[in-house]
Amino acid sequence: MQNIPPQVQAMLGQLDTYQQQLQLVIQQKQKVQADLNEAKKALEEIETLPDDAQIYKTVGTLIVKTTKEKAVQELKEKIETLEVRLNALNRQEQKINEKVKELTQKIQAALRPPTAG
């Protein structure tokens, strides 16, 4: 790092920050995707039950009884919320990837030896 110009060192620091942000976004995306898959499976399962089926849900540390209609409505809302969150994370990941690519190109250009013209 001693022979690297200060401006390139600063860009390398920024690149490291972007890569850390990207890792966090990817982890969040994986969690949201897992939650979304779980909610969709639960909805599929509940929709196969008769309308008068006894359904229970967890609320904190409690398990409470609910109706099929209410459970379906809550799951659909949860799925919608998770899909919005997933789309936002996808956009965030894309923006960070673009910044990483752009900064990598700048670093490579700055480190490239000047060509004789």
Swiss-Prot record:
Its main location: cytoplasm. Transmembrane segments: none annotated. It is found in: Cytoplasm. Keywords: Chaperone, Cytoplasm. InterPro entries: PFD_beta-like (IPR002777), PfdB (IPR012713), Prefoldin (IPR009053). GO terms for cellular component: cytoplasm; prefoldin complex. It holds the Pfam family Prefoldin_2. One of its GO terms (molecular function) is unfolded protein binding. Molecular chaperone capable of stabilizing a range of proteins. Seems to fulfill an ATP-independent, HSP70-like function in archaeal de novo protein folding. Belongs to the prefoldin subunit beta family. Heterohexamer of two alpha and four beta subunits. HAMAP family: PfdB. PANTHER family: PREFOLDIN SUBUNIT 1 (PTHR20903:SF0), PREFOLDIN SUBUNIT 1-RELATED (PTHR20903). This is Prefoldin subunit beta. It comes from Pyrococcus horikoshii (strain ATCC 700860 / DSM 12428 / JCM 9974 / NBRC 100139 / OT-3). The gene is pfdB.
